[in-house]
Amino acid sequence: RMSRGLGDVYKRQTQTEKNLQAAFAGESQATNKYTYFASVAKKEGYEQIAEIFRKTSANEQYHAKMWFRELEGIGTTAENLAAAADGENFEWTDMYDEFAKTAEEEGFSELAEKFRQVGAIEKHHEERYRALLHNVETAAVFEKSEVKVWECRNCGHIVVGTKAPDVCPVCNLSLIHISEP
């Protein structure tokens, strides 16, 4: 077994790195596919089969996470936000733009339009991640320069102010459960 920390070795474009990337991609696709299959089985009245799809999906999700960790793809929240923003940027500036052009050239105009629309959504995702990253980097996640509405995600209590309370005054849960609605 290769241990965590061999990221520099993987970065040399070894076959093992390619295998890890393929394993991550395959397991990631499988977890989504089995979730979709579970919905169909449940809708058709096959609850036991739906549960097996859901259970297998959870297994595949763990496998994907395991391979992603080996690739050292999980960092701090700030690193993860930056990586997510970069990924979303690639999707809207390159990937979906190219997909739309190809679909258009091949006569799939409706699909080309969907690619463009999803590209616009990916742009919004990038902007959201970059704003969140800025908040993390400037310690502005739980404190703002202007008055905000803060909501306890547990009980729904609302607080208005520049800073989220350290503890919800209603349910006593800590700051991590309070966010802007």
Language-model-detected regions and their locations in the chain:
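Short domain-boundary/entry signatures in modular proteins, especially
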Residues: G73-T77
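Cys/His-clustered metal-coordination modules, chiefly Zn-binding fingers
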Residues: A120-S179
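Inter-helical turn/loop segments and adjacent helix faces that build the functional surface
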Residues: K43-Y46, K101-L111, V136-A139
